[in-house]
């Protein structure tokens, strides 16, 4: 239980803004940390859903509401995944050999490629939320659990690059099996929750998550020879923009079909 409690505190101190007393990052203390990362996603999804309920009474402009929707996940997670996203974008944009890309991942400075992509990312996510149908919000709220569960599962199951520090997250024997079982359970819960909310929204949302995961696999193994923590963080940000993107594109296509029939 002591190790579980230590992992819980580390998960919330590293992956959220919620206060948790800092403890030493050792392999023993981090053995179960991935179990609690999707719980942060559940809190983000819940708060986002509550924002959907109260925002019409607080603001009149959809744009401001969309900006808040885009910023809430970043704010509540403490920007935990953005750093890895920046570094991976920098490495991919360099078009250098694998060894140089891995070196860029270790660089703590952000290049102009990362800054440009970041600005484009936030413009796109704000635009998506500003046009998102209200009935899609409950489904997308589950997406914050799904993205983090896939993040955890990949760290446990995928081969790591030689430069990766992900081994700190990976236990051995029984503890590793427990973490994998929890990740699979989170994935099942989020998928079932999406389908129960609205199957017509859930399917494109899951397609978006699948596309992001396949792209993640391609980037990790083709460009870097395995995953690193930064590349896994890159996946979370890509997944959380692909899900609303595919949902919105599907909604637009459906409206165009209906308009064409009329």
Describe each model-derived feature in a short phrase.
Residues 98, 149-184, 224-227:
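Solvent-exposed interhelical
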Residues 29, 218-242:
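Interfacial loop-to-transmembrane junctions
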Residues 17, 81, 90, 118, ...:
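Alpha-helical transmembrane segments and their lipid-water interface positions
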Residues 31-48, 91-135, 139-140, 177-194, ...:
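Multi-pass membrane catalytic core of lipid/isoprenoid biosynthesis enzymes
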Residues 34-89, 138-142, 201-222:
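Membrane-embedded alpha-helical segments that form the functional core of polytopic membrane enzymes
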Residues 20, 43, 47-55, 72, ...:
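Alpha-helical membrane-inserting segments
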């Amino acid at each position: 239980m002591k190790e579980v409690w230590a992992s819980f505190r580390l998960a919330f101190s590293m992956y959220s803004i919620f206060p948790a007393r800092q403890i030493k990052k050792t392999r023993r203390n981090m053995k179960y940390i991935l179990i609690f990362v999707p719980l942060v996603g559940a809190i983000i999804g819940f708060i986002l859903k509550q924002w959907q309920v109260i925002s019409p009474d607080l603001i009149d402009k959809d744009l401001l509401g969309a900006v808040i929707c885009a910023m809430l996940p970043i704010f509540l997670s403490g920007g935990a995944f953005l750093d890895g996203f920046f570094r991976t974008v920098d490495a991919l944009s360099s078009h250098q050999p694998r060894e140089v890309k891995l070196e860029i991942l270790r660089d703590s400075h952000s290049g102009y490629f990362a800054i440009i992509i970041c600005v484009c990312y936030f413009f796109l996510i704000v635009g998506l939320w500003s046009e998102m149908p209200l009935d899609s919000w409950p489904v997308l709220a589950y997406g914050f659990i799904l993205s983090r569960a896939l993040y955890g599962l990949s760290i446990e199951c995928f081969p790591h690059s030689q430069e990766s520090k992900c081994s700190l997250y990976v236990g051995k024997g029984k503890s590793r099996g427990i973490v994998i079982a929890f990740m699979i359970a989170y994935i099942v819960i989020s998928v079932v929750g999406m389908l129960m909310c609205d199957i017509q929204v859930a399917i494109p949302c899951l397609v978006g998550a699948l596309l992001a995961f396949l792209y993640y696999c391609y980037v990790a193994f083709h460009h870097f020879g395995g995953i690193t923590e930064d590349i896994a963080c890159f996946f979370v940000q890509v997944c959380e923009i692909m899900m609303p993107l595919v949902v919105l594109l599907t909604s637009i296509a459906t409206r165009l079909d209906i308009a064409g029939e009329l």
